[in-house]
């Protein structure tokens, strides 16, 4: 299916690009989330009329993400979990736990924005986690997992 992108999409293209994607990806993700529209003649003409407005909105989102990223980058957060004497956690710290921790600290972060390269945290200690605030703004934070011996 040919679509026109209404915002920058990672690994796909930038605002205004006309790209070919699988039908399911377009119907189930891109179009419902208002990231794209079918690339019909009418849609392309309407996009060209609204292009400046969409570019302005995209620039505002990027600026807001960069401002939050400057505050968040390099910060360290602590979370306490039950653990055994050997330092292994009972359960794990997931991206949802990290997103909740960041929300309590005053940052508006969704769990889908938290990237954990090694998967959920299962040991006590300091761990690096990435937060993707925007497709162009990815910041690193440190999560210090403190063990609460049961």
UniProtKB/Swiss-Prot annotation:
The family database entries (PANTHER family) matched by this protein are listed as:
50S RIBOSOMAL PROTEIN L9
Q: What family is this? A: Belongs to the bacterial ribosomal protein bL9 family.
Q: GO cellular component annotations, sorted alphabetically? A: ribonucleoprotein complex; ribosome
Could you state a single Gene Ontology molecular function term? structural constituent of ribosome
**What function is annotated for this protein?**
Binds to the 23S rRNA.
* Gene3D superfamilies (UniProt xref): Ribosomal protein L9, C-terminal domain, Ribosomal protein L9, N-terminal domain
* Keywords carried by this UniProt record: Ribonucleoprotein, Ribosomal protein, RNA-binding, rRNA-binding
Which InterPro entries does the record match to this protein? Ribosomal_bL9, Ribosomal_bL9/RNase_H1_N, Ribosomal_bL9_bac/chp, Ribosomal_bL9_C, Ribosomal_bL9_C_sf, Ribosomal_bL9_N, Ribosomal_bL9_N_sf
Sorted alphabetically, the Gene Ontology BP terms of this entry are:
translation
Which protein are we looking at?
Answer: Large ribosomal subunit protein bL9
From which residue to which does any coiled coil extend?
A: none
């Amino acid at each position: 299916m040919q679509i026109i992108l209404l915002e920058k999409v990672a690994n796909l293209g930038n605002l205004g690009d006309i790209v070919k994607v699988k039908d399911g990806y377009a119907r189930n993700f891109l179009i419902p989330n208002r990231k794209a529209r079918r690339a019909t003649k009418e849609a392309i003409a309407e996009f060209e009329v609204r292009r400046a407005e969409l570019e302005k909105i995209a620039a505002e989102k990027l600026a807001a993400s960069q401002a939050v990223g400057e505050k968040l980058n390099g910060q360290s957060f602590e979370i306490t979990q039950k653990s055994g004497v050997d330092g292994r956690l009972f359960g794990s710290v997931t991206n949802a736990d990290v997103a909740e921790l960041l929300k309590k600290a005053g940052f508006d972060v969704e769990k889908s924005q938290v990237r954990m390269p090694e998967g959920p945290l299962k040991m006590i200690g300091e761990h690096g986690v990435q937060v993707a605030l925007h497709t162009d703004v990815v910041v690193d934070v440190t999560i210090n997992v403190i063990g609460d011996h049961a």
